[in-house]
Regions:
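Repeated scaffold domains used in trafficking and secretory/extracellular systems
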Residues: 20-27, 59-67, 103-112, 142-151, ...
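Fold-core signature of tandem repeat domains
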Residues: 66, 71, 85, 110, ...
Length: 228
């Protein structure tokens, strides 16, 4: 009898009357393979002689981010709607014990050397935005989304609403010290950003470019940005 299997010898015996020997053998082999198969999450790199088992996350939905010598783990809650964020340090293939950074997180990203994430707020569809370096720091509230830009600043999307023009929101920029308004009522479907700045169309058709802390209205009546 296989203690970790639902297949019993009596099941195989009863199949012999209606199935071929080959079919019964295949069922038995599959049951044995299922019992001895390695399951769960493993970490390995060029220093490891054997993969490191990450048993703490077994049986849960988890996603992993590797950044430098850090291993970040998003361990999802039962609803799969939010997750807890853990951080490990990896040294010569040895994975440190988990350090919990926060819970009830909706989304996260590594920007520079910091972890940025949106944390759900009870009773609200929006989130608080945090940055975690050596400790947790709240950057802003009522945040719908965010993105890191090539110059190290962070684009923050707030006051998100749906309209006849599509999804529109107010755009803010965090420069490492403060958050400043870029523009109100920007159409998110047409927004593009690069190392040159941010281009977008405001509700009503104004084509705008934000670059070097200045907002320029390029044209009116625009409905699509092909490239930027």
């Amino acid at each position: 009898e296989l203690s970790d299997s639902t297949v019993r010898m009596s099941d195989l015996d009863s199949q012999l009357g209606s199935s071929s020997v080959e079919s019964v053998v295949e069922t038995a082999v599959s049951a044995v393979k299922a019992c001895i198969k390695k399951t769960g999450y493993l970490y390995a790199d060029t220093h490891s002689t054997q993969p490191v088992k990450l048993d703490a996350y077994n049986g849960k939905k988890a996603e992993f981010i590797i950044s430098g010598d850090k291993l970040f783990v998003k361990s999802f809650d039962d609803s799969n709607d939010t997750f807890s964020l853990f951080r490990h340090t990896v040294t010569n293939g040895v994975v440190s014990a988990a350090e919990m950074l926060d819970t009830s997180i909706k989304a996260c990203n590594i920007i520079g050397a910091d972890v940025w994430y949106r944390r759900s707020v009870t009773g609200s569809s929006l989130c608080d935005l945090y940055k975690y370096s050596t400790e947790k720091e709240k950057i802003d509230g009522d945040v719908a989304s965010f993105a890191g830009l090539s110059d190290g600043s962070v684009l923050i999307v707030k006051n998100f609403v749906s309209s006849s023009d599509g999804e529109i929101a107010d755009l803010y920029l965090y420069d490492g010290k403060k958050t400043s308004l870029v523009a109100e009522k920007a159409e998110l479907k047409n927004m593009k950003y690069s190392d040159k700045g941010i281009s977008f169309i405001r509700s009503g058709g104004d084509l705008c470019i934000y670059s070097k802390n200045k907002l320029a209205i390029i044209d009116g009546g625009a409905y699509n940005i092909i490239a930027y």
